[in-house]
Amino acid sequence: MPATALPPSGDPSGGAGGGPGRSGGPGKPGGPGGSGGPGRSGGPGATGGPGSPGAAKTCDARGMAEIHRMVRSGFGEGRALIGGVAEGDAVHADVVGDHLDMLSKALHAHHEGEDTLLWDTLEGRAPSCAGHIARMKAQHAEMLVHLTALDAALPAWRSSGRSTDAAGVLDTLDGINAALAVHLPDEEQQVVPVMETTLTQQEVDALSEHGRKATPRGKLFLQLGAILSAQPDGGDEWQREHLPPPVRLIWRVVGKRKYQANRAELVGDIRP
């Protein structure tokens, strides 16, 4: 499975087919856990050492951008979701707050996986990437400040639904979105290409596994729906590539309904 994809652990519904990760099922070439494994596009004649231009690909790390889309979309609509909560409507505020909490946990886990599993390995094999990695670490530290502030601001608003309590949440969302606007494209442009000529598929899959284990219990279908809806085609290709047929069936019959029901509660009366 590409880096840091959907984490289904802790949710009993995630057991079918090994959860909504890259299944590596019949007909999918490449290393364990996913298609397009080592050497997917490098081919004969590729030159250069790990991390250098022209080096052969050793893994498929497209999942970084796929998860980034979910994070960007989810936090990006945060202000509108909060604006759709009527003054004092604590029930609706709790639904929106729970959604933002899920996104916060997902981003926490995504960055934790990179901090513990990626940076040292990448720097050791591609020393020329040291400057990029130092910048990523600094950006993660900044994001941690914003996410910690969000985690602290959410409970009061979820309990009251009052605009006075929403103000703190909105401030933290502004900080998160500003930081994401810098960090995500920087990582995709400067780090992911180095990953794809430096890491093995098993190492990329370990990042995915770290993320999978972090999904809060009961949030599997909601997070899967968020990932799918953030993809350019609505997630059709993502499903075909990442989900084995039995899991796609479970999503269509059970998961999609749960996601859509939650989405209806979540959106409520969004104001322009």
Regions found by a protein language model. Name each.
Residues 1-272:
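Small-residue-biased structural context
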